Amino acid sequence: MAVPKKRTSKSKKNLRKNTWKKKVLKRAMRALFIAKLDLNNLQDNVATLEDSNETSS
């Protein structure tokens, strides 16, 4: 017959949740960093294309 398990303590539950949140925050910060880096590279490429078009005209 199934017996209910003991309840997980609040501190243990919060500890696990905080560990998960730290992992998610770390991945989100990395994704944001990569997105900003790509955006800056894109802007640099557009600026160099505009400069080369002005000099060739």
Swiss-Prot record:
One of its GO terms (cellular component) is chloroplast. GO terms for biological process: translation. One of its GO terms (molecular function) is structural constituent of ribosome. Residues 1-21 are annotated as: Disordered. The lineage of its organism: Eukaryota, Viridiplantae, Chlorophyta, core chlorophytes, Chlorophyceae. The keyword Transmembrane does not apply. It is found in: Plastid, Chloroplast. SUPFAM superfamilies: Zn-binding ribosomal proteins (SSF57829). Belongs to the bacterial ribosomal protein bL32 family. The keyword Hydrolase does not apply. It comes from Stigeoclonium helveticum. Keywords: Chloroplast, Plastid, Ribonucleoprotein, Ribosomal protein. This is Large ribosomal subunit protein bL32c.
